[in-house]
């Protein structure tokens, strides 16, 4: 599902590196995580919505690719982001 503009702005403000930052890996991963969490709630009610489930898997893959890029380039930022979003154990 799509985030409404107020939710999107709050996620961007929480993870932006500087004013107007919408493209850093941290912001991209945070936005994808918010969309993934929204879709996960959707699937609790609509268990047989397989078409949306394929979209969810694409979002998870995109987030994984961005996280891999961040891990390759800057491990400190990667670990901080994982901790902040609570993505790993």
From Swiss-Prot:
Signal peptide: none annotated. This is Small ribosomal subunit protein uS15. It holds the Pfam family Ribosomal_S15. GO terms for molecular function: rRNA binding; structural constituent of ribosome. One of its GO terms (biological process) is translation. PANTHER family: RIBOSOMAL PROTEIN S15, BACTERIAL AND ORGANELLAR, SMALL RIBOSOMAL SUBUNIT PROTEIN US15M. InterPro entries: Ribosomal_uS15, Ribosomal_uS15_bac-type, uS15_NS1_RNA-bd_sf. Part of the 30S ribosomal subunit. Forms a bridge to the 50S subunit in the 70S ribosome, contacting the 23S rRNA. The keyword NAD does not apply. Belongs to the universal ribosomal protein uS15 family. GO terms for cellular component: cytosolic small ribosomal subunit. Residues 1-24 are annotated as: Disordered. NCBIfam families: S15_bact (TIGR00952). PROSITE patterns: RIBOSOMAL_S15. The keyword Zinc does not apply. Residues 1-21 have a biased composition (Basic and acidic residues). Keywords: Ribonucleoprotein, Ribosomal protein, RNA-binding, rRNA-binding. CDD domains: Ribosomal_S15p_S13e. It comes from Desulfovibrio desulfuricans (strain ATCC 27774 / DSM 6949 / MB). One of the primary rRNA binding proteins, it binds directly to 16S rRNA where it helps nucleate assembly of the platform of the 30S subunit by binding and bridging several RNA helices of the 16S rRNA. Forms an intersubunit bridge (bridge B4) with the 23S rRNA of the 50S subunit in the ribosome. The lineage of its organism: Bacteria, Pseudomonadati, Thermodesulfobacteriota, Desulfovibrionia, Desulfovibrionales. SUPFAM superfamilies: S15/NS1 RNA-binding domain.
